[in-house]
């Protein structure tokens, strides 16, 4: 832990209000992005005379994305509210761990939907899966839009996770290297 404050440390504290503002802005931006992702996905359905009705709940990747989007929106709202309360702001490790978890969940749901979209768009002929987007074009377009919004949400949480990691680890000094040990080697 730091035992003294020097000029460089006070320079770091000068940027903390801007960092807090950027962090809060990203959290608040993630909320409408997550809500829009959920809305587009949940209301997405298309009927095809040959294959029948296709809804989001027919595909587990889309259900997972809706679940993670709901978690992202709720967590972003809770974390933004908690960042205004002084007793929670000092708990950098809580934000660090929870931001990491949410970012990892977001990237897993992006990957799952991206794989599902790739298979729906291109098919897998070696496995005898035909592409489905020619039959369900509107459905695929809305999935693509939801995937783009969810990817932007992930990017917000990725930057938030980097900021919270900086906050959690910036209270520690870098490792001390003894100059005698360096000269002796």
UniProtKB/Swiss-Prot annotation:
It is found in: Cell membrane. The keyword Cell membrane applies. This is CASP-like protein 2D1. Residues 1-15, 86-92, 167-185 are cytoplasmic. One of its GO terms (cellular component) is plasma membrane. InterPro entries: CASP/CASPL, CASP_dom. Belongs to the Casparian strip membrane proteins (CASP) family. Homodimer and heterodimers. It comes from Glycine max (Soybean).
């Amino acid at each position: 832990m730091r035992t003294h404050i020097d000029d460089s440390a006070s320079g770091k504290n000068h940027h903390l209000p801007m960092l807090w503002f950027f962090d809060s802005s990203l959290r608040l931006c993630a909320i409408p992005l997550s809500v829009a992702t959920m809305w587009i996905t949940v209301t997405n359905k298309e009927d095809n005379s040959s294959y029948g009705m296709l809804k989001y709940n027919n595909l587990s990747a889309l259900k997972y994305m809706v679940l993670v989007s709901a978690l992202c929106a709720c967590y972003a709202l809770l974390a933004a509210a908690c960042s205004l309360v002084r007793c929670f702001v000092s708990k950098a490790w809580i934000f660090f761990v929870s931001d990491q978890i949410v970012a990892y969940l977001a990237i897993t749901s992006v990957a799952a939907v991206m794989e599902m979209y790739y298979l729906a768009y291109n098919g897998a002929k070696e496995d005898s899966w035909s592409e489905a987007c020619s039959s369900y074009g509107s459905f695929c377009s809305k999935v693509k839009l939801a995937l783009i919004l969810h990817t932007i949400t992930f990017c917000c949480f990725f930057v938030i996770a980097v900021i919270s990691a900086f906050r959690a680890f910036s209270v520690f000094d870098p490792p001390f290297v003894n100059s005698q040990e360096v000269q002796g080697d």
